[in-house]
Each structure stands twice: as structure tokens, then as C-alpha cells.
A protein has these predicted regions:
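Short loop/edge segments at beta-strand edges and connector loops
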Residues: 31-33
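Long, positively charged amphipathic alpha-helical accessory segments at protein N-termini or as interdomain linkers
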Residues: 2-29, 39-199
Length: 199
């Protein structure tokens, strides 16, 4: 299953980080589609979100006649308090939380990722979808999609599909459609999805 949908791996890796951080430090993090990990730093509404980026995930995939190769990169700000804050600082300040070492966090991330990969391989994206949505930041978020010709359309984020691409709903047309992460930039603070600039 994963060989036909390698794009889902970045979402599983992000979820593994969120689960591992919660398990090892008690800190609850969230996922910004497609691959960033954030800490909610204050009370907010859908339009006023106060977030601090704590990490991210990147996956590079290649295939040949021998199969699929994935290279996974995971970054978490564990100890660097500047320019914003570190995970261990947040954990120390949180009641019931505590610092975690690199080795313990990496082991926990890999354990969670292995479990998630096994679950998806056995039963599909649906096996982990609800856990993913508990951690992600975008349920019912209004955004504006801009296509390559510059046309804009207001839509509502409704989820991710079985490949990990963003599903949105347009009230005007009544249609759902998919927004791919490749070639698009998601400015969550501005509520805008637009084609990435090519240099």
C-alpha cells in the first residue's frame, strides 16, 4: 500500500513526532499541512492562531525496478531557545512535563513511526486518519486558493485524502477538490494557498 502512496509517509512521520513528543515530554504539538510541526502558544480562534514552529518533516522518494526508496528527514527544536523557544524549555515550564534527551526522543519517534506505517500498510490511511486529525491545525479552516492563472476561490479545508493531499470544499460550486503540496505554498496565517514562485 505505501509503495503506491509514498506521499502519505510525511504525514505519518509528522504524526509520529507529535505522538513521541507528547509521550516523552507531555507537550502537545500540532501538524500544519503538509509537513510542519507547531506549538499553540495561546488561546485562539480559527482566524487568530498564535503558533510557534517547533519542527518539520521532509521526505524524498525515488523508485526504480528494484522498488521504492524513501529518505526521511525530521527536525525538532529540542534545546535552542532562540529565536523563539525550544521543546525542552516548553516542557520544563509545563506542569507535569519534563525535559527529554535526543536519544529518547529519536527512539520514541521511530517506534511511533513503525507502528503507524504498520497500521497503514495493514488497513490503509483510514487506520490513522482520526489520530492525525486530532493533531492537525486545519479542520474547517477557510482559505483562498489561487491557481496558476491568478484566479482566486474561497474554500474550506475538509481534510486530507488517502495520498495526503489537502481536500477543500467550495461553497460556491458545491464541489470538493484536492490541492497538492508539490508546487503550492500554504500561508496559514494569511489563509492563502497559491502556486510557489519559480526562480
Amino acid at each position: 500500500m505505501l509503495a503506491s502512496r509514498p506521499s502519505i509517509v510525511q504525514h505519518l512521520a509528522a504524526l509520529a513526532v507529535v505522538q513521541a513528543v507528547k509521550e516523552t515530554t507531555g507537550v502537545a504539538l500540532n501538524i500544519k499541512w503538509p509537513n510542519d510541526i507547531y506549538l499553540r502558544t495561546a488561546a485562539e480562534t480559527v482566524q487568530n492562531i498564535n503558533l510557534t514552529k517547533m519542527g518539520g518533516v521532509v521526505v524524498a522518494a525515488s523508485s526504480n525496478r528494484n522498488g521504492l526508496t524513501l529518505v526521511l528527514g525530521v527536525g525538532v527544536n529540542l534545546d535552542n531557545a532562540k529565536p523563539t523557544c525550544s521543546l525542552n524549555r516548553v516542557a520544563e515550564d509545563q506542569e507535569g512535563g519534563g525535559k527529554v534527551g535526543k536519544e529518547k526522543l529519536i527512539a520514541s519517534i521511530l517506534n511511533h513511526l513503525e507502528l503507524l506505517l504498520d497500521m497503514v500498510e495493514a488497513g490503509g490511511w483510514e487506520e490513522v486518519e482520526q489520530e492525525y486529525y486530532k493533531a492537525w491545525l486545519h479542520s474547517n479552516q477557510p482559505v483562498r486558493v489561487t491557481d496558476k492563472e491568478g484566479r482566486e476561490e474561497d474554500v474550506l479545508v475538509v481534510g486530507v485524502d488517502k495520498f495526503g493531499f489537502l481536500r477543500v470544499h467550495c461553497d460556491k460550486s458545491g464541489e470538493d477538490f484536492t490541492v497538492f503540496d508539490d508546487g503550492n505554498s500554504f500561508d496559514m496565517m494569511a489563509g492563502l494557498i497559491r502556486p510557489k514562485s519559480r526562480v
